[in-house]
Amino acid sequence: VRGVILAAGQGQRLRPDTDALPKTLLPVTATETILDTIVRGLAEVGVTDLAITVGHAAERIREHAPVLEDRYGVSVAIVDNDKPHWNNAYSLWTAREHYAHGAVLVNGDTVHPTSIERNLLAAAATDPRLLIALDDHKQLTDEAMKVRVGAGGVELIHKQQPIATAAGEYIGVSLIPTGVAEDLTKALEATYTRDTTLYYEDAFQLLAEAGQIGTVSTGPVAWTEVDDHADWALAKTIAEGL
């Protein structure tokens, strides 16, 4: 199983801190960036063959890759996103060769404990579907990537849906099994071809409608997606405990 990290984003709401920096390289401890915490977590569960998609300020991640390799004992392949102004459905599609034989997918702006990856890998041993980490404990907001679950698995993954009928929030970490990889690639292509501003979760929705997505609970853990300065402050607090 490989690791695929989506790190092409700037994070407009984090400017000017991200003017010359991808948001994944924002520091969260004295020695680690967001990206460091992700790579360390993957290495801790034995996922050491990594691909990182780059776009905004790509050279900064290129410079940091050898540090990641030395520090965490991983190998890093850089995947160039030639259309960084498109959304992440395209960004993930550019990494299709890297998830073809199974991968843990992590959004480059999420700070979370390693238990997330560990639980996904354990569940994948008996569940052949694409599995998403679902926080079914926290209070949902309008901004959350909400997930509705039915008897056959995920039915709807979208921010625009009623909080009342959502089971939880997708935290931006998932497991792509070999058996679903080709269908995911086709779904991603259909998604960005339809609209370049769409997210990879819009491709996940196509798979959900075919009964190909399951959920794994995060349990009551602290995590955050870093979209603004308040999130960044929270990420620093969480990272200190990882």
Ranges and model annotations:
Residues 1-5, 32-103, 194:
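Conserved N-terminal catalytic core of the sugar/cofactor nucleotidyltransferase
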Residues 113-193:
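Conserved core of the sugar-phosphate nucleotidyltransferase
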Residues 25, 147-149, 215:
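A structural signal for short hydrophobic beta-strand segments in well-ordered beta-sheet cores
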Residues 1-19:
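N-terminal nucleotide-binding beta1-loop-alpha1 segment
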Residues 20-36:
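Short catalytic helix/loop segments, enriched in acidic residues and glycine
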Residues 1-3, 167-242:
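Conserved alpha/beta core of the MobA/IspD/sugar-nucleotide pyrophosphorylase nucleotidyltransferase superfamily
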Residues 24, 75-77, 212-214:
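Conserved beta-strand segments of alpha/beta enzyme cores
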Residues 69-145, 149:
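Conserved beta-loop-beta/alpha segment of the NTase-like Rossmann-fold superfamily
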